[in-house]
Structures are given as C-alpha cells and as structure tokens.
Amino acid sequence: MEFPEHGVRLLGRLRQQRELGFLCDCTVLVGDARFPAHRAVLAACSVYFHLFYRDQPASSRDTVRLNGDIVTVPAFSRLLDFMYEGRLDLHNLPVEDVLAAASYLHMYDIVKVCKGRLRKKDPDLETRTLGTELPGQPPHPLPSWSPAFCQAAPKAKHPSLGVKATHPLPTFGPPSWQVAEQSSGALDLSLKPSPRPEQVHPPCRLQTSLCSSVQQVAQPLVKAEQDSFSEQDSSSPQSADRSPPPVCASAAQGLAVDLEPLHIEGTGSQQLGLPAEPVLDSEELGPSRHLCICPLCCKLFPSTHALQLHLSAHFRERDSVRARLSPEGSVPTCPLCSKTFSCTYTLKRHERTHSGEKPYTCVQCGKSFQYSHNLSRHAVVHTREKPHACRWCERRFTQSGDLYRHVRKFHYGLVKPLLV
C-alpha cells in the first residue's frame, strides 16, 4: 500500500520543525546570518554537506561556515527553502547568485536549472562570446556547418586540396571519438550534435582559396621546415625525399561544406607516415560547431580533442626523424654550456634555450613556439572550446592549468581526502 502524499507531509513537518528550531542539530553561518537546520536534510540535498559531515569529527559538526564571497545570504536562504519545500523561488534574486551558491554546495540539479534560465534570458550570450576577436586572431572565423550555406555554395573542386565527398552517409549513433571522451570520467558539458534532419540536402564541395598574405607567410614557414630537416644526416633516404606539408589559408572565404563525409587527399598525413584520420561527418560536427584546422598540414577536424591527437602524431613523426643517435664514439654536447645529452634531438631542443629559436608556428595567427606541446595547447585558443571540465561544479576551462588552479582554490577540501 502506497501513500503518495507521504513525502509532501514529511517535508512540511521538517519545515515546521526548522522554523520552530525543534530538533535542529546544526547551524550554517553565511557572513553574519545564522541558519538552523537538520544535518540529515542538508547532507541529503547537498554533496558539500554530505562530505563535510562524513569527514569532520563529531565535535566540530555543530557549525558550518560557508564562503561569503561565493555564497550570498539571500541565495543560501532560497536554497535552504528548496531543501525543505522542493520548490525553488528565483523571484527578485539574481540567477547568477543562486548558480554560484549551488555550484559551491554541489547541488547539480539547481546548477542545470540556473544555466538553462540564463540561456533563455540571453540566448545570444554564447554567440557574442564566440564573436569576440582575440589579439592576433583572424577577423573572420570559419563558417559553421549549415544546410542553407551548403545549398548556396559553389560545387567546384579545388585542385590543390583535392576534397571529395566519396563515402556514403554512416549509420546512426555517436562517433567513436565522442564515446572515447565520454568514457574518460570527466563531466562533459560540450554541445552535442543535433539529431540528423529528416531530409538530407544535396551534397556540395569544399572550396578554399589561398590568400596572398598567407602565401607570403608560408614562405618562411616552409623554409624553416626545410632547414629543420636539413640539420639531420643527409644519408637517410627518407629525410632526403621528404617534402614539407602545404600551408593553407587560415580564414577560408567561400567555405562550402558537405552533409556527407569529407576525405582530404594529396599531401599531408600520408606523406608524413601518420595514421589515417577518421572521415568527418556532418553529424559529428553539428550545425553549431566550427572547424578545427591543423596548423601544420591544414587537415580539418571536428573538435579540439581530435586536433590535439593529430598534432601529437605530427610531432611524434618529426621527433622520430630528429632523434637519431649521434655517430659511435661521440656524445651530443652543447657547444655553449658543455652540457651532454643522450641523443641529437634533445641537444637541439636544448640549443633553443640559447638561440631563442621558435620552429613551431601557428598559421592562423603567426605566433611561434619553442616546443610542439605549446603549439598544441595554443590551438585551443582559436577554436574557443573548453575541453577541461571540473568534476565537482561543472565549470569548464580552455587550459588544464586554469582547471588546476580552480580546483585548488574552490575544491581543495574535496580533493584532499582523495589524495590521502
């Protein structure tokens, strides 16, 4: 026999007990305000209180002090009423304050509701954020994938890129790279691709043209690549026949895309001996995503994660060519500081600290870096994506260092028990 109203009556009686101060066994302090409450209710509704009462000794559980810089008194009062009533009142209260307090207390249902309210309140907020230009970035981002743009695009094929839509549409289901990201354990808030439209629009070709300014920038870039490879032993036939990858325009005007998978032929990963990349599908990209372009070979990717994997393959191949051991009987030694190294490649990396050489250049903004991993991290700046997610409050960050500082500042009390 079930009593559907039992939960409502139980919450009502607990609310009456809190208002009367009856059986309240703890006090929450927010600034100068005091809120008597029941530990069981707080721990049942908030992960923060659950961990606090689980880890704190019994002698220090009577009073809980919250960070007044993050949790305001009105916001916590509304959240406390929600715990006892099951109803959230956002009238005459900034949603941002409730969102900050709910994130601090790890009340994830409230966090999702507040974020949805903010998106409805200002739907163009995300668009304006993406439209803000960063210093040194091209003024026009790559156009997004859309059927209307695809219909209006010219169906010509650029001979230098060799882009052809030759594969059939794949079956339904999430792409493999998304499944790999979801299985990593981090909470993913990135936009998922929208469902496939019922009517597929006619295919069109991908077409770009090289800007003269980019061609001018490409000259020293190609020369730098040739110089870096010429430093190796000329006896190797592979390094002698190797040619640098082409450089394409960063802001491709008149970019037309296909709703079918795209396959890029010609020079690129095949010449470098890199593993074959998965074919891009419109379902993987989604209508609201921008393309990610490899700064070394101009290959297109649907996400920053896929681009970084591709860049790591680039650098592994380049490092394997450069990291040949020196001839027998000689130890690689720096001529400036006499420091010795295990192989020639590590010596060349060390020499950059003396010369200031920056061989890794981003073709989108022209910024150069001394090491390959710095260029890989920099590529995220142009895509505006935030792949690093906080597992406790759902905030996302562009760089892993920003996530680390956020966790140390706001969630150190939660991380410390996990490290013991």
From Swiss-Prot:
<feature type="region of interest" description="Disordered">
    <location>
        <begin position="222"/>
        <end position="247"/>
    </location>
</feature>
<dbReference type="Pfam" id="PF00096">
    <property type="entry name" value="zf-C2H2"/>
</dbReference>
<dbReference type="Pfam" id="PF13894">
    <property type="entry name" value="zf-C2H2_4"/>
</dbReference>
<dbReference type="GO" id="GO:0007517">
    <property type="term" value="P:muscle organ development"/>
</dbReference>
<keyword id="KW-0539">Nucleus</keyword>
<keyword id="KW-0479">Metal-binding</keyword>
<feature type="zinc finger region" description="C2H2-type 4">
    <location>
        <begin position="388"/>
        <end position="411"/>
    </location>
</feature>
<keyword id="KW-0805">Transcription regulation</keyword>
<feature type="compositionally biased region" description="Low complexity">
    <location>
        <begin position="227"/>
        <end position="241"/>
    </location>
</feature>
<dbReference type="GO" id="GO:0003677">
    <property type="term" value="F:DNA binding"/>
</dbReference>
<comment type="similarity">
    <text>Belongs to the krueppel C2H2-type zinc-finger protein family. ZBTB18 subfamily.</text>
</comment>
<keyword id="KW-0678">Repressor</keyword>
<dbReference type="GO" id="GO:0005737">
    <property type="term" value="C:cytoplasm"/>
</dbReference>
<feature type="region of interest" description="Disordered">
    <location>
        <begin position="127"/>
        <end position="204"/>
    </location>
</feature>
<feature type="zinc finger region" description="C2H2-type 3">
    <location>
        <begin position="360"/>
        <end position="382"/>
    </location>
</feature>
<feature type="zinc finger region" description="C2H2-type 2">
    <location>
        <begin position="332"/>
        <end position="354"/>
    </location>
</feature>
<dbReference type="GO" id="GO:0008270">
    <property type="term" value="F:zinc ion binding"/>
</dbReference>
<feature type="zinc finger region" description="C2H2-type 1">
    <location>
        <begin position="292"/>
        <end position="314"/>
    </location>
</feature>
<dbReference type="InterPro" id="IPR013087">
    <property type="entry name" value="Znf_C2H2_type"/>
</dbReference>
<dbReference type="Pfam" id="PF00651">
    <property type="entry name" value="BTB"/>
</dbReference>
<keyword id="KW-0863">Zinc-finger</keyword>
<dbReference type="GO" id="GO:0000122">
    <property type="term" value="P:negative regulation of transcription by RNA polymerase II"/>
</dbReference>
<keyword id="KW-0963">Cytoplasm</keyword>
<dbReference type="GO" id="GO:0005634">
    <property type="term" value="C:nucleus"/>
</dbReference>
<keyword id="KW-0862">Zinc</keyword>
<dbReference type="GO" id="GO:0005654">
    <property type="term" value="C:nucleoplasm"/>
</dbReference>
<dbReference type="InterPro" id="IPR036236">
    <property type="entry name" value="Znf_C2H2_sf"/>
</dbReference>
<feature type="domain" description="BTB">
    <location>
        <begin position="24"/>
        <end position="92"/>
    </location>
</feature>
<dbReference type="InterPro" id="IPR000210">
    <property type="entry name" value="BTB/POZ_dom"/>
</dbReference>
<keyword id="KW-0677">Repeat</keyword>
<comment type="function">
    <text>Transcriptional repressor. Specifically binds DNA and probably acts by recruiting chromatin remodeling multiprotein complexes.</text>
</comment>
<keyword id="KW-0804">Transcription</keyword>
<protein>
    <recommendedName>
        <fullName>Zinc finger and BTB domain-containing protein 42</fullName>
    </recommendedName>
</protein>
<keyword id="KW-0238">DNA-binding</keyword>
<dbReference type="GO" id="GO:0005886">
    <property type="term" value="C:plasma membrane"/>
</dbReference>
<dbReference type="InterPro" id="IPR011333">
    <property type="entry name" value="SKP1/BTB/POZ_sf"/>
</dbReference>
